[in-house]
Structures are given as structure tokens and as C-alpha cells.
From Swiss-Prot:
Gene: ndhJ
Superkingdom, taxonomy of origin: Eukaryota
Broad enzyme group: translocase
Function summary: NDH shuttles electrons from NAD(P)H:plastoquinone, via FMN and iron-sulfur (Fe-S) centers, to quinones in the photosynthetic chain and possibly in a chloroplast respiratory chain. The immediate electron acceptor for the enzyme in this species is believed to be plastoquinone. Couples the redox reaction to proton translocation, and thus conserves the redox energy in a proton gradient.
Compartmental location: Plastid, Chloroplast thylakoid membrane
Keyword Thylakoid among record annotations: yes
GO cellular component: chloroplast thylakoid membrane
Organismal lineage: Eukaryota, Viridiplantae, Streptophyta, Embryophyta, Tracheophyta
Protein name: NAD(P)H-quinone oxidoreductase subunit J, chloroplastic
Keyword Methyltransferase: no
Length: 158
């Protein structure tokens, strides 16, 4: 079954893959990393003006990494705004996805957290650096193949 947004993207010859609907009836689409920035701009112009959240996860050990965006189309006088979930998958060896910071500024810290925890590099992000872990930290703690160190060096704040 195809949702409204998927039908609109097909009508305008924009490449994507429909992943169906989640348990709340929200349409989920897969977009290729190379197409993500241009489709993000189109979605913003189409009315998806609110980025509700962005997160990332490790699909499987040795597999792909995913960056997930939850977008909402907020309009005056509409009680049930349209929502869509976009998934962008990247290879583990060189996980690069275009940043959508210049489309939705609210993604700033969320993309930085995804970089810090999973190592996904968001191209053209203005401040892509670690946000939770120290800059000297080695590895990506939320990857399924991450091996936790046996010790942690605690630095004195004084």
C-alpha cells in the first residue's frame, strides 16, 4: 500500500522505496544517501516544516547503519498533522549521509549525537564533533561490534 507522500514522490519521479506504515499509521520511506538532501529540501517546500526527531541505529553486526528522521507537516487549523518517517541507510565502512542542518536547524545536536555514538558522518554539518563522549574517545559506543574498554580514565576537573 502506498501513502500520500510516496504517491506524490512517484508522480514527480523522485526515487525512494516505501517501507509501509508503522503501528501508528505513519508512512515510512527509504531514501538513498545521495538523494537525501534534495528530497529533504523538497519535503520542506512541500510543507514538512518540523523535524520532530532524528536518531540513528546499527541495523546488524557488520551491516548497515541507519539514520531516521521523523517529519511533521504543521499547518494552521489542522488537528491531525501529516507525519512521515524517513530512513537513510549508510555502509558501515564509510557511513556518510548529507546533513539536513540547513533545512531543519533543530537537527544540529541530534546529528552530532548520531555521529558521536555510531560514527555516521553528516556531510556539510557546521559543527560535526563529539557531543557526549570526550574528543579523545576511540570507537563508536552504540555500534553492535563495539568492544567496550576494560577501564575508563577519569580526569580530575580541577
Amino acid at each position: 500500500m502506498q501513502g500520500n507522500l510516496s504517491a506524490w514522490l512517484v508522480k514527480h519521479a523522485l526515487i525512494h522505496r516505501s517501507l509501509g506504515f508503522d503501528y501508528q499509521g505513519i508512512e515510512t520511506l527509504q531514501i538513498k544517501p545521495g538523494d537525501w538532501h534534495s528530497i529533504a529540501v523538497i519535503l520542506y517546500v512541500y510543507g514538512y516544516n518540523y523535524l520532530r526527531s532524528q536518531c540513528a541505529y546499527d541495523v546488524a553486526p557488520g551491516g548497515l547503519l541507519a539514520s531516521v528522521y521523523h517529519l511533521t507537516r504543521i499547518e494552521y487549523g489542522v488537528d491531525q498533522p501529516e507525519e512521515v518517517c524517513i530512513k537513510v541507510f549508510a555502509p558501515r565502512r564509510d557511513p556518510r549521509i548529507p546533513s539536513v542542518f540547513w533545512v531543519w536547524k533543530s537537527v544540529d545536536f541530534q546529528e552530532r549525537e548520531s555521529y558521536d555514538m555510531l560514527g555516521i558522518s553528516y556531510d556539510n554539518h557546521p559543527r560535526l564533533k563529539r557531543i557526549l563522549m570526550p574528543e579523545s574517545w576511540i570507537g563508536w559506543p552504540l555500534r553492535k561490534d563495539y568492544i567496550a574498554p576494560n577501564f575508563y580514565e577519569i580526569q580530575d576537573a580541577h
